[in-house]
A protein has these predicted regions:
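Short, acidic, metal-binding catalytic loop of nucleotide-sugar glycosyltransferases
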Residues: 29-33, 44-56, 82
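Short amphipathic alpha-helices and their capping/turn segments at secondary-structure boundaries
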Residues: 1-11
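Acidic metal-phosphate-binding loop of nucleotide-sugar-dependent transferases
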Residues: 123-125
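Conserved catalytic core of nucleotide-sugar-dependent glycosyltransferases
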Residues: 95-110, 127-205
Length: 291
């Protein structure tokens, strides 16, 4: 049980530094790497929750209990500055992680026996009304349903002041993926398994009417996340922030993201276009126009 928490009907989880994910990976406590991740979390993920217009939620950061004391002090400082934020230090074992999820029930303020849990990565962000949107589903009719905002804004920094942004539609994305549960059969969203299978394993509510979505950063360390540069739009920093403000994503900063150099590659599509005779291109267009 996590003592002294402000309880709420909506609780989020961030798997920040427990060393049981993806097998052998980089040391999360290596000084430069720690600093890089910490700044992105503080200026992107955490700031997006500071901007929520509904503050009736709790965000739990799951850490390794082996985190160095000076690093712990920095997270505890963030906790003191943000009433919704709590650090949970656990052993580097799956059993300890599972116990933390089970014990999180003590930190839920059930509303008519119903609550919602959600997940987010430590380098992504949600729109300012994310919690408010989830609050509409704290009803018994939705118990057992997952909730997804399928639109994503993928951001990659390519120069000091320039960014690529790609809008993407992905129903089972992990940015704010949520699950409606109850007191009798409490289950968290992290117990549903891999997020990309959630829409196969549970009935899912897609908030498609929203003109907004979450931000996924491409920052050089999240190798699983990718961007299709051919579908991205170039923005300078000021333009990017203005665009995201229209999507109710405000006050976050991307100037900690690493810069991706332009790849010295030519796409397969461009290569093939060099070898296709013009007459075949014309015929292809005519065939397409018939369907």
């Amino acid at each position: 049980m996590i003592e002294g928490l402000n309880k709420a009907p909506i609780v989020g989880f961030v798997r920040y530094s427990q060393k049981i994910t993806f097998g052998i990976e980089r040391d999360v406590f290596e000084p430069n790497y720690f600093e890089y991740r910490f700044n992105i979390f503080k200026n992107v993920t955490l700031e997006s929750f500071r901007q929520q217009n509904n503050q009736n939620f709790v965000l739990l950061l799951l850490h390794s209990e082996n985190m160095p004391s000076d690093y712990k002090a920095r997270f505890l400082k963030l906790e003191n500055e943000n009433k919704f934020l709590y650090n949970v230090f656990v052993k580097d074992t799956q059993k300890s992680f599972d116990e933390a999820l089970i014990n999180s029930v003590h930190n839920i303020d059930f509303l008519n026996n119903v609550a919602i849990t959600f997940r987010i990565d430590n380098d992504d962000a949600v729109q300012n009304d994310f919690i408010q949107q989830l609050s509409h589903f704290i009803k018994s009719d939705f118990v057992g349903f997952s909730i997804s905002i399928p639109k994503q804004y993928i951001v990659k920094r390519i120069t000091e002041d320039d960014y690529l942004l790609q809008e993407n539609y992905y129903p089972a994305n992990s940015i704010g993926l949520a699950y409606v549960t109850n007191k009798e059969n409490y289950k968290t969203v992290l117990e549903l398994g891999q997020h990309h299978l959630t829409n196969e394993n549970t009935p899912m509510v897609l908030l498609e009417n929203s003109n907004k979505g979450g931000v996924m950063t491409i920052n050089g360390e999240n190798a699983i996340n990718t961007m299709d540069d051919t579908k991205a739009i170039l923005y300078n920093e000021k333009e990017l922030y203005k665009y995201l403000e229209q999507k109710k994503i405000t006050n976050i900063r991307f100037d900690d993201l690493r810069i991706f150099k332009k790849e010295n590659r030519v796409s397969l599509k461009k290569i093939l276009s060099l070898f296709i005779p013009p007459i075949l291109k014309i015929l292809t267009l005519k065939v397409k126009s018939l369907f």
